[in-house]
Regions:
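Glycine-rich and polybasic anion-binding loops at the starts of cofactor/ligand-binding domains
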Residues: 1-179
Length: 179
């Protein structure tokens, strides 16, 4: 089975194991339709004429890898932004790690998207900005959106300055041959 078909076939199982807000669900469904129609980009597309994805799409991937990584702070601390105080949102193999993250609501919001979606006060901001920067008809953007489980929500009000840098850190353990 080709990777595109494997992804499309597995999306229903992905949906069933993901608890997600209705707003996000709508974005994911529309994105899946775009990916289904366009598939992976090929060299026939001007922007991809010098890049072949054949070596990527012709592999067998674990689409839903196990995420029992056991990573501890001592394993990843050296990858954080120097040794200064920052707000951190950390993901391990695509899964949020509350133990490695340091978020805030001290006059600004640095938290998980799901946490922001659960609060009515954030709805106007999310409706105005969420998923606006993505090129919606680009197939790889659509694929990423279709399988999105979680994200970071950062809101800094006008005339407010974050006292600490904000880091969004993604670690891949390499334990699974994940896409």
């Amino acid at each position: 089975m080709e990777l595109k078909e494997k992804l499309l076939d597995s999306h229903l199982a992905f949906e069933e194991q993901s608890e997600v807000n209705e707003t996000i669900q709508g974005f994911r469904t529309r994105a899946l339709r775009v990916f289904e129609k366009k598939g992976f980009p090929t060299r026939k597309i001007e922007a991809w004429k010098y890049t072949s994805l054949a070596s990527v799409v012709n592999k067998n991937y674990a689409l839903f890898p196990r995420t029992d990584s056991g990573i501890e702070l001592k394993h990843v601390k050296r990858y954080f932004l120097y040794d200064i105080d920052t707000y951190k949102i950390v993901f391990i193999d695509g899964i949020y790690s509350p133990f490695l993250s340091e978020t805030t609501h001290d006059g600004l919001d640095v938290c998980l998207l799901s946490a922001a979606l659960s609060k009515q006060k954030y709805k106007p901001i999310i409706d105005k900005y969420f998923n606006k920067a993505a090129v919606k008809d680009e197939s790889l953007t659509a694929l990423n959106t279709a399988f999105a489980k979680e994200g970071a929500y950062i809101y800094i009000p006008k005339n407010k300055v974050s006292e600490n840098p904000i880091e969004i850190v993604h670690f891949s353990t390499g334990e699974q041959k994940a896409l």
